[in-house]
């Protein structure tokens, strides 16, 4: 009898051990599956971009893809849009203000009274730069 009791008592922990091992294997398989899914996310994203988002999910219906479903709100958002005319080139530029100085016209070289020798010198310098 003692041998039978020992044998019966030894079976219970073995069964529990086997069940635990099976559960651990199932959990490990699930973890491996999830790891594989995570490792391929980047590749799947690149594939979807390459396909141009052409794949359709089961939740996408044909009615949502029909052009008649898209509503045109342009007349509500910007009613009777008209372009404003650009200013003419003949008008004076805006007034320039710098601390205490004011000017109503754009500056030009004529106002600086540039002498002819200075202009010739500038042309000579520009010509020598071109040769380099």
From Swiss-Prot:
Belongs to the DIF1/spd1 family. Its main location: cytoplasm. Phosphorylated by DUN1 in response to DNA damage which leads to its degradation. The gene is DIF1. GO terms for cellular component: cytoplasm; nucleus. InterPro entries: RNR_inhibitor. GO terms for biological process: protein localization. Mediates the nuclear localization of RNR2 and RNR4, 2 subunits of the ribonucleotide reductase. This is Damage-regulated import facilitator 1. One of its GO terms (molecular function) is ribonucleoside-diphosphate reductase inhibitor activity. Keywords: Cytoplasm, Nucleus, Phosphoprotein. Residues 1-41, 108-132 are annotated as: Disordered. Interacts with RNR2 and RNR4.
């Amino acid at each position: 009898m003692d041998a039978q009791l020992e044998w019966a008592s030894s079976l219970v922990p073995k069964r529990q051990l086997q069940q635990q091992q099976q559960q651990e294997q199932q959990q490990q398989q699930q973890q491996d599956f999830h790891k594989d899914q995570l490792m391929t996310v980047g590749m799947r994203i690149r594939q979807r971009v390459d396909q141009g988002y052409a794949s359709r999910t089961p939740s996408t219906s044909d009615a949502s893809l029909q052009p008649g479903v898209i509503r045109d709100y342009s007349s509500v958002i910007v009613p009777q849009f008209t372009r404003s005319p650009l200013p003419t080139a003949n008008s004076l530029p805006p007034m320039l203000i710098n601390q205490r100085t004011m000017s109503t016209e754009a500056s030009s070289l004529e106002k600086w009274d540039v002498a002819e020798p200075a202009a010739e010198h500038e042309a000579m310098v520009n010509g020598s730069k071109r040769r380099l």
